[in-house]
Amino acid sequence: MSQRTFNEIPPIVSASEPHMALLFLLDVSRSMSGDPINSLNASINKFKEQVCTDPRTTEILDVAIVTFNHETQVVMPFTPVAYMEPVNLVASGGTEMAPAVQVALDMVDERSRFYRHAGTEPYKPWIFMISDGYGGDISAVSEVVHQKENDGYLKFFSLGVEGYDSKTLHQLCGEKVLKLNGYDFTGILDWAHKSMRAVSVSSPGEKVRLPALPENVDKDVNDWFD
């Protein structure tokens, strides 16, 4: 089956309904090679399949994918989830986190403006970062993340993979750091799917009760969503 070009993908479906923007910010540096990147690819692709079994979530969810190693790449701009193509990410290179975080912030800001111009009410967007490495100097971009969260513009949290730099992720996300035990991303991406479903049956601005985390992920996240 031939892949669609981005020009063939509608910018939004059901514009009269509230919409949710979810951006996956994914570390594809060399240390993610082998089982980690293979599991991540399979789990991202399964996430799309799971979301699309629920008509309501499919209707309101737009997803973007940004990867980073020593460079930042927008693998997929914000796209209605039903139009996601399978990913086949390849791990290589070093880790430079700050530029990728800034790209993610800019994309979320632009998506929020797009919703406003379309007359679409937005849910608070999520940036979900997955990383196993040391990200370099993130002090400046961390301040931007904290300010945007404090102002109520987004939720930014991260999943640390085996060997991750805890100090870096906590500097960026505060308490909103999850820890993955092992390299199986299936459970956490299923959690993301169920979280999007919980958002989809809420009203924008309403506190959402999130599902329990999978057994191989540590942290209780519900206090983050006040």
Predicted regions mapped to residue ranges:
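Acidic, polar low-complexity linker/tail segments
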Residues: 1-23, 28-38, 52, 112-117
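DG-centered beta-turn motif at the end of beta-strands
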Residues: 26-29, 40, 65, 104, ...
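Mixed-charge (Asp/Glu-Lys/Arg
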Residues: 29, 135, 141-147
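An active-site-proximal "capping" alpha-helix that borders the catalytic cofactor pocket
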Residues: 40-52
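Arginine/glycine-rich "motif VI" loop of SF2 helicases in the C-terminal RecA-like domain
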Residues: 55-56, 146-154
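Short, charge-patterned binding micro-sites
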Residues: 62-88
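Von Willebrand factor
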Residues: 73, 83-123, 135-137, 155-169, ...
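Von Willebrand factor A/integrin I-like adhesion domains
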Residues: 158, 162-225
